[in-house]
């Protein structure tokens, strides 16, 4: 049996990965080139003004030096393509995935998820086509039931794949706009935007960890049980019994799919709680200082 695309999940993952990697890398270079000259000019002027204020005693020396160092580091990350690649992009695209892989329960690399889904898709399609050949062209009830079972299975596979593929793509998108967001870290009014950007990257890192723990177990379990379940379905007595068996297979996949689809919300709650807690702590600290000053 020949499919139009023998490995659809791997093919789609590769196509989108190459497209986004190429396009976003080009956009990142464009952004860095656009903000480099004006940012360096503004920061140079700001450092001169900051030095004058420190000399005149209008700004605390320690505070002024700390601000200058912070701004210098941020600017170096923004305008230096090598610095941004080494200290920001490589952390979230290389270091974090390698670190996450160490916590694998099944030993199944997370990168093989598309290939595993391709195998499941190919095996199930062989059985689906065999059962479809047994249904008469005038048996509308069985045809409708069969198509429903087929679409449910497609939906479970594609939704699980979508969660997996979206993590990598959206991480690339956030990293591509990183230089623009980091500019906001220099200013007090826009510093929260940069903090939320970092928080979102941490959320995707947590999601990658959860996928490595949960998705690999779910997919490996489904692949292991699939052969047995399809064998039982194939040798069922009647076509109607086989279609019922397909729905039972759908229920099995839906259970695993629910676990995978829930992971983004869990990662978002953990990451959001962390940053909400950090903001609350900073506000509480500010109120305490205000009370001390009034006292």
Swiss-Prot record:
For the keyword Mitochondrion, the answer is: no
Q: Which NCBIfam families match?
A: PRK13852.1 (NF010426)
Span-the-membrane segments of this chain are 35-55, 68-88, 167-187, 201-221, 226-246, 251-271
GO cellular component terms, semicolon-separated:
membrane
The family line of this record is: Belongs to the TrbL/VirB6 family.
| Family matches, as InterPro entries | Conjugal_tfr_TrbL/VirB6
Query: According to its record, how does it sit in the membrane?
Result: Multi-pass membrane protein
Subcellular location per UniProt equals: Membrane
Q: Name the gene that codes for it.
A: virB6
Which organism does this record belong to?
Agrobacterium tumefaciens (strain 15955)
Q: List the disulfide bonds.
A: none
Does this UniProt record's set of keywords contain Transmembrane?
yes
Share an example GO biological-process annotation for this protein. Answer: protein secretion by the type IV secretion system
Name of the protein = Protein VirB6
Q: What does this protein do?
A: VirB proteins are suggested to act at the bacterial surface and there play an important role in directing T-DNA transfer to plant cells.
